Structure formats: structure tokens, C-alpha cells
């Protein structure tokens, strides 16, 4: 939000400090997109008039099955994870509304742009299979992978070590994402 509103305009250097269980001078991150997926179906009584319903929760089930099947075709660094945020009100009512929130991550913005349509296609399949209407709401802009300034990292580390800080070996695992990465572009 600060970046989008110009808070970093004219800034030549920005630094993020993040709590961690050990000292580290930088951490690699993944690019990320985040979306809410809403299905609009038609509520009906599950026993009396099920044929009149359009089950929005079933649409999420189809999407989740699709995502599960998609995983074997993803790059090893791609991640897709999420939750159902709304799935119905009662067992005897076919839910007319259902929602899920999903995050998908990849090594960089380009790889993320390849992953994103595959994820969205799984949710579109849920709509096609059930007749529900899909509404996709991005939760903000995609966040980039972090672009590190290794000269700045070296100076930070040298100064911190002169103050007695002891650093852990650098992590080779790329995990997590941050909006600060967009400042690093």
C-alpha cells in the first residue's frame, strides 16, 4: 500500500528487518499472488428440492480436486495453498454461496504468471461442472521475489558482526513472500 501510494518515490535504498529464530543477513523469497474465489449458486433444500439447487460448495470441491491433480505438473518451487472460507450454513441446505482463499507462489514473477492461469482454470472448472458463477477477487497486486543488493548485505553483515552478532549459514530454502519485495524491484 505504501509503495502504491508513492511512499518510496525518490528512495535509493530501503532495508527490511524481520524477526527470525537466528541471525541472517538476507532471505530468499517467492513471488506470490493471492485471491478470493467466490461461487454463486442457488440454495435449495437438500432432500425436498435438490434438483433446483446449484451447489457452490461442490464447485469448490471440483476446484480443489483440480488443484490436487495439477500438483504433479507444477515446477518443484511452485506452491498452491488455501482454505475454504465459506461452505454453507446447514447440512440439509444446498449452499448457494461458497468461498475460498488461495495463495500461489513461484520463484519469480514470470514463473508466477505461468502458474496463475493454471490455478484459475481449476476454479473455472468448478463453475463449469456445477453451473455456479465464479467471481475472482485478487487480494492486491502480485508480490515479486526479493531482489537483494549484495553490496548492502555485505556492509550490513560487517557492521552487525562488529557489534557481536553471529550469523547462521545462509539458507538455501526459498520460502515465504513479502510485499517489501516489490520495493526491491
Spans of model-derived segments:
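Histidine/acidic-residue-rich, glycine-tolerant segments that coordinate divalent metal ions
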Residues: 1-95, 105, 178
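Metal-dependent amide/peptide-bond hydrolase catalytic core
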Residues: 61-185
Amino acid at each position: 500500500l505504501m509503495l502504491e501510494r508513492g511512499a518510496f518515490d525518490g528512495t535509493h535504498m530501503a532495508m527490511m528487518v524481520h524477526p527470525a529464530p537466528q541471525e541472517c543477513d538476507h532471505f530468499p523469497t517467492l513471488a506470490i499472488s493471492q485471491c478470493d474465489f467466490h461461487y454463486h449458486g442457488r440454495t435449495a433444500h437438500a432432500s425436498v428440492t435438490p434438483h433446483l439447487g446449484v451447489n457452490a460448495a461442490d464447485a469448490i470441491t471440483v476446484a480443489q480436486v483440480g488443484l490436487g491433480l495439477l500438483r504433479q505438473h507444477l515446477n518443484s518451487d511452485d506452491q498452491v495453498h488455501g482454505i475454504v472460507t465459506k461452505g454453507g450454513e446447514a447440512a440439509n441446505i444446498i449452499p448457494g454461496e461458497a468461498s475460498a482463499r488461495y495463495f500461489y507462489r513461484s520463484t519469480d514473477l514470470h514463473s508466477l504468471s505461468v502458474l496463475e492461469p493454471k490455478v484459475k482454470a481449476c476454479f473455472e472448472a468448478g463453475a463449469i461442472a456445477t453451473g455456479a458463477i465464479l467471481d475472482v477477487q485478487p487480494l492486491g497486486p502480485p508480490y515479486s521475489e526479493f531482489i537483494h543488493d549484495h553490496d548492502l548485505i555485505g556492509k550490513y553483515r560487517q557492521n552487525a558482526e562488529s557489534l557481536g552478532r553471529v550469523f547462521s549459514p545462509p539458507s538455501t530454502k526459498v520460502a515465504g513472500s513479502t510485499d517489501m519485495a516489490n520495493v526491491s524491484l
